[in-house]
């Protein structure tokens, strides 16, 4: 639980500072940092842009991402010639269309889609939907689910931008999302629909640290990185299930 989160936070910070130190030592100039939409905390309005003020994070994970962003910004200001791009991931889901690469959570999945696929495969008895009394159209939380293949392409675009010296500043930030908010219940129903199965799920109490809603305004990434999310949600949920089936055959 929270003890593990704190330990992970410490590991993340130490590892990140080590990477920055090694970059200086070996004369490496460019870094792409995996940040997260958790840095926005509970935003006041949707969608969020890169200019949306960062609020206090609602989890140790979000807190760490905020700290790493700050360390990166300060390091790039202190070491001329170094450049960095922070990609604020929204909610990455899905697997490679080959069903050969995907997400393999250790223990109980902390993310929604692996829990959905494990429940569908009979590895988990029941999926808990945490809260259906939020001020959203169907009462469940809203997130921006980005296909992992699209996310990988955003990294390539970020690397190419720095390699081609196209950066406007030494430190740039981009939202990596679809620009569309999807509720948890909507996602569950969509998964059932595209994969022709019924999920055993129940409504559970709200979970501490969950924000009500967040989705991206990806205009900056569309414009400056020449990147946009292309894979439809239906296809992503299909690949997630194909990956789970592939795991079952191993």
Q: What spans do the regions from the language model cover?
A:
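Short, small-residue-biased leader/transition segments that mark boundaries at the very start
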Residues: 1-6
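Catalytic helix-loop patch of NAD(P)-dependent Rossmann-fold dehydrogenases
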Residues: 10-18, 25, 30, 39-91, ...
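Alpha-helical segments that scaffold the active site and NAD(P)H-binding pocket
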Residues: 21-22, 73-74, 117-121
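Structural signature of the Rossmann-like NAD(P)-dependent dehydrogenase/reductase core
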Residues: 31-33, 85-88, 144, 175-176
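Residue(s) in the substrate-gating loop at a strand-loop-helix junction
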Residues: 36
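C-terminal substrate-binding subdomain of Rossmann-fold SDR/epimerase-dehydratase oxidoreductases
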Residues: 112-250
């Amino acid at each position: 639980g929270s003890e593990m989160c704190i330990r992970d936070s410490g590991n993340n910070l130490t590892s990140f500072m080590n990477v920055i130190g090694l970059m200086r030592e070996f004369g490496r100039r460019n870094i792409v940092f995996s940040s997260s939409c958790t840095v926005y905390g509970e935003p006041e309005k949707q969608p969020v842009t890169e200019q949306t003020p960062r609020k206090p994070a609602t989890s140790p994970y979000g807190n760490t991402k905020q700290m790493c962003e700050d360390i990166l910004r300060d390091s790039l200001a202190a070491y001329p010639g170094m450049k960095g791009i922070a990609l604020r991931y929204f909610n990455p889901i899905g697997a490679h269309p080959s069903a050969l690469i995907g997400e393999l959570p250790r223990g109980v999945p902390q993310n929604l889609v692996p829990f959905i696929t494990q429940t569908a495969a009979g590895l988990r008895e029941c999926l808990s939907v945490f809260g259906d009394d939020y001020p959203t159209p169907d009462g469940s939380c809203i997130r921006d689910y980005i296909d992992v293949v699209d996310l990988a392409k955003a990294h390539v675009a970020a690397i190419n931008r720095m390699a081609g010296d196209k950066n406007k500043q030494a430190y740039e930030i981009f939202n990596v999302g679809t620009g569309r908010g999807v509720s948890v219940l909507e996602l569950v129903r969509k998964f059932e629909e595209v994969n022709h199965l019924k999920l055993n799920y129940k409504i559970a109490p709200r979970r501490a640290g969950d924000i009500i809603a967040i989705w991206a305004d990806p205009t900056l990434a569309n414009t400056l990185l020449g990147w946009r999310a292309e894979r439809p949600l239906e296809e992503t949920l299909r690949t997630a299930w194909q990956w789970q089936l592939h795991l079952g055959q191993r």
